Each structure stands twice: as structure tokens, then as C-alpha cells.
Design a protein with these regions (language model features):
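Hydrophobic alpha-helical interaction segments
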Residues: 55-138
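Short gly/ser-rich loop at a beta-strand->alpha-helix junction or flexible surface loop bordering the NTP-binding
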Residues: 8-71
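Basic, Lys/Arg-rich alpha-helical nucleic-acid-recognition elements, primarily the DNA-binding modules
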Residues: 1-2
């Protein structure tokens, strides 16, 4: 498992200094940065391409640059939320999952299982409530 780490300097030469890396292989890297960068927006930063405008301050990117599918954007969101399971991340993930379930795929993932429990009205520690998700998702 790749752990999100705050890199000081150029720990990976593909990304700007100070980036947070969420996932990487030899061929691709998923990261967030405040710096301007020539990379493909992904995860929560690409939700606006699918009709969802988030208010998250971080910007998420993937290299190499390429056209991403909805499934790839959703998978990158899951990777970000795995490493930073904040309520805002989980709320936006739930909204995207509800709106685009058939197109994004219902990938079996522990986070999706918990989101599905929330959508059934269950209380899941650390996750938004059903009302919170529905309130923002309207």
C-alpha cells in the first residue's frame, strides 16, 4: 500500500515541491498541490466535469496527462479518501457515487460499503449522515 506523504522538496521529480502524493506507480502518480501544474485534474477536482461543483480547497491531479474516464476519476477519489478520510471528502464521494452509480461503477470498496450504509439511514462513525449528503447533493 502506498501511504500519502507530504513530500518536502522534489521527492518525486514529476510533481511540484510540497505536493501530497496519494498513489504512484512507475507510470502514473496521483497528487495534490497548491502550485500551478501542467497535469490532468482528477478526483474531486474533476467532479465539475460531471455536474458536481465541490468547495474543496485542495486541487488533485494525475500524471501523465491523459483523458480520464469517469471510473478513473471516481477511483482516484477513493484513493484520496482512503488516505484522508475527512467528512468533506466522504460527503462529496457519496454525492458523486449517488449521482453516477451506474456510470462510475459500483466498485466493491470498504468506503462504498459504508456510504451505502449511510444511504440506508445507518449512522457510520466519521461519515456524513444521510441528511448531510442529501442536503449538499441537491
Amino acid at each position: 500500500a502506498v501511504v500519502a506523504q507530504h513530500h518536502v522538496g522534489h521527492a518525486d521529480p514529476r510533481v511540484p515541491a510540497g505536493s501530497i502524493i496519494y498513489y504512484k506507480t512507475r507510470r502514473e502518480i496521483l497528487f495534490s498541490t497548491k502550485a500551478l501544474t501542467d497535469a490532468t485534474p482528477t478526483g474531486f477536482s474533476a467532479y465539475s466535469d460531471y455536474g458536481i461543483k465541490t468547495d474543496l480547497p485542495a486541487r488533485y491531479f494525475r500524471l501523465p496527462k491523459k483523458r480520464l474516464t469517469m471510473k478513473e476519476v471516481f477511483r482516484d477519489s477513493l484513493r484520496i479518501a482512503e488516505r484522508e478520510p475527512t467528512k468533506p471528502h466522504l460527503t462529496w464521494l457519496a454525492i458523486f457515487h449517488l449521482k453516477h452509480k451506474s456510470e462510475a461503477g459500483s466498485e466493491m470498496h470498504p468506503i462504498i460499503g459504508k456510504i451505502n450504509a449511510v444511504m440506508r439511514g445507518e449512522d457510520v462513525e466519521g461519515y456524513p449522515t444521510f441528511r448531510e449528503v442529501r442536503g449538499i447533493g441537491r
